[in-house]
């Protein structure tokens, strides 16, 4: 075994777990809660929700099955298991509720990638809702199916803007990209664990197979560098259930107050409302 952080583990484990979790599969909390904190000491880990061997992110929320007929192999090529969900209609649709749900799911996926430890990777075009029309293996094509479409639709513009702000938010909070994996304990006696899990009750995460929600709190002080002022604590709630869920939120540290920065169903608040904090 070689320990070298310049090497990275590029595999589909995070993607498969994230896609299952996002579309509401049962018994995913134990797996996804580990994946978002994974940052092994030996090599880096690359997190993504789409790559060149499967659906684009937009297609993962728009198609239940692959459409590779144009490849000339009778649709036998390409990954069979894409862990996708079309949100109610196969392919493009004009139904507003379905498109709103797809947009919401895309934001959920991007948030999982960019709010997790490890190295985030966004497949080119996913930030602009690029589609391959359900083709998950267009390596042999040189046409509009394989070309990256830099969309100018309202949805594409909204997703691009959301992605930019999410990247900015990650850069502003070192606690989201620590040099080592969180230990889930207060090993420096700061008053809070470096990372902790919560659920409908604060400090109690119920990872039962039927649950589809949990939350994470990061103690920003664990990201203090060279004596610089400690960062804000972060509380991130994940709910992939199809109904609203109430979360228990721990008391803020040192008489601070919690402030909402963004939600995937409504987007980011204005910078003056806390994105810089």
Residue ranges and their predicted role:
Residues 198-250:
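Carbohydrate-binding surface patches
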Residues 92-103, 149-157, 275-277:
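Active-site rim elements
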Residues 53, 114, 133, 167, ...:
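Hydrophobic alpha-helix feature that most strongly marks membrane-spanning transmembrane helices
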Residues 132-164, 257-270:
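Extended hydrophobic/aromatic segments used for targeting, binding, or gating
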Residues 242-277:
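C-terminal beta-sandwich/jelly-roll accessory domains of carbohydrate-active enzymes
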Residues 193-201, 271-276:
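Surface-exposed intrinsically disordered loops and tails
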Residues 152-183, 198-201:
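Aromatic- and carboxylate-lined catalytic core of secreted/periplasmic carbohydrate-active enzymes
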Residues 1-124, 128, 137-141, 174-177, ...:
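Conserved alpha/beta catalytic core and glycan-binding cleft of carbohydrate-active enzymes
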């Amino acid at each position: 075994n070689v320990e070298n952080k310049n090497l990275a583990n590029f595999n589909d484990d995070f993607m498969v777990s994230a896609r299952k979790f996002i579309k509401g599969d049962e018994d995913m909390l134990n797996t996804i809660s580990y994946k978002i904190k994974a940052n092994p000491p030996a090599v880096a880990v690359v997190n993504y929700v789409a790559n060149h061997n499967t659906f684009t992110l937009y297609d993962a929320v728009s198609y239940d099955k692959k459409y590779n007929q144009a490849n000339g192999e009778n649709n036998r090529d390409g990954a069979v298991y894409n862990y996708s969900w079309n949100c109610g209609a196969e392919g493009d649709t004009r139904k507003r509720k379905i498109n709103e749900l797809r947009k919401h799911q895309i934001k959920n996926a991007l948030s999982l990638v960019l709010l997790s430890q490890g190295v985030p990777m966004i497949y080119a075009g996913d930030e602009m809702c690029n589609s391959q029309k359900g083709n998950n293996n267009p390596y042999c094509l040189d046409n509009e199916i394989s070309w990256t479409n830099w969309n100018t639709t309202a949805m594409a513009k909204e997703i691009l803007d959301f992605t930019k702000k999410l990247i900015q938010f990650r850069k502003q909070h070192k606690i989201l990209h620590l040099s080592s994996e969180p230990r889930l304990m207060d090993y420096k006696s700061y008053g809070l664990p470096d990372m902790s899990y919560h659920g409908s009750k604060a400090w109690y995460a119920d990872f039962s197979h039927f649950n589809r929600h949990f939350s994470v709190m990061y103690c920003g002080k664990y990201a203090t560098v060279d004596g610089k002022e400690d960062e804000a604590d972060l509380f991130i709630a994940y709910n992939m259930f199809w109904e609203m869920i109430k979360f228990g939120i721990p008391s803020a540290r040192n008489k601070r107050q919690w402030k909402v920065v963004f939600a995937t169903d409504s987007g980011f608040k204005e910078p003056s409302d806390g994105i810089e904090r």
